[in-house]
Amino acid sequence: MKNEMLALILAGGQGTRLGKLTQSIAKPAVQFGGRYRIIDFALSNCANSGINNVGIITQYQPLALNSHIGNGSSWGLDGINSGATILQPYSATEGNRWFQGTSHAIYQNIDYIDSINPEYVLILSGDHIYKMDYDDMLQTHKDNMASLTVAVIDVPLKEASRFGIMNTDSNDRIVEFEEKPEQPKSTKASMGIYIFNWDRLRTMLVDAEKNNIDMSDFGKNVIPAYLESGERVYTYNFNGYWKDVGTIESLWEANMEYIGEDNDLHSRDRSWKIYSKNLIAPPNFITEEAHVKDSLVVDGCFVSGKVEHSILSTNVQVKEGAQIKDSFIMSGAVIGEGAKITRAIVGEGAKIGEDVEIDGTEEVQVIGYNEVVGVPNED
């Protein structure tokens, strides 16, 4: 039986620009917002859009990501007719190898895709923060009788040269694609979200492999090839909040934007929840000496210091006299007595010693996973 649409999440990115935060885990597994990991947003969008089968394509440091996703039950993807499948590079008789690009990762998993037998494939990135109804995008794809639909978002003209830009006619049909143009003709930036008719994409990828044609990347190869061959390629115009958190600055900004009673992501909208793996932790304890203002404090935290406009993830400890401002503290971190942290990201399990000062006023500071700063050796 043919399934309508299969989602494939590209989650193998190393995320080198995130430095210490991705030395031991893939970028989509990085924590966000106190109780989530970045990939939770793509997975939750799939669940909320009614997509039953999701393939997660991993490569770099997949252990934390695999453990987090498990069997997909946190997103309702563990039913009889649904599933979350981790797809990793493997060796085969015809020379499967490490993924050479985004579309090459799809080609290497043709057998899995064929086993689902979808009419459409939805290609997603696992490292963006946003909420989107993929079913609405699919309807646009059908209405346009498209072979490929690319989700786009309007960006300021001065930033357009950082993106792949789609130039369209009055009906949103793409007539030209420019990869990071110096002088952009439009502000419609690709979000790295695509819907393809699977039969057509499959044929193109297989033929390219047989004929030794480079078709390894959607932006560099596949989209230009579709346009050159006259395929019906359209945009889906997205107007909501979307953030590429591929740099330290953008990850910090997205977390700071997430704080607040009514943020642009509408995080408290119960009609479109963001799901994640449930971690059991005791209730928070806020001491008499503590002062917490305009902050998100997740389960299991012990706070005896001052916290302002910050996020404390699960099981964070803030000792007496410590001061945290405009910072994102990941789970299990310990902030020592009298420490002062400003505009920083503190990694999971990090320990900050007494009276240590971390000042990110000029540039956001990062403390890595399990990193110890200013704590004497116990030996």
Curated annotation (Swiss-Prot):
Its EC number is 2.7.7.27. This is Glucose-1-phosphate adenylyltransferase. PANTHER family: GLUCOSE-1-PHOSPHATE ADENYLYLTRANSFERASE, GLUCOSE-1-PHOSPHATE ADENYLYLTRANSFERASE-RELATED. GO terms for molecular function: ATP binding; glucose-1-phosphate adenylyltransferase activity. Keywords: ATP-binding, Carbohydrate metabolism, Glycogen biosynthesis, Glycogen metabolism, Nucleotide-binding, Nucleotidyltransferase, Transferase. One of its GO terms (biological process) is glycogen biosynthetic process. Alpha-D-glucose 1-phosphate binds at G164, E179, K180, S190. It comes from Streptococcus mutans serotype c (strain ATCC 700610 / UA159). It catalyses: alpha-D-glucose 1-phosphate + ATP + H(+) = ADP-alpha-D-glucose + diphosphate.
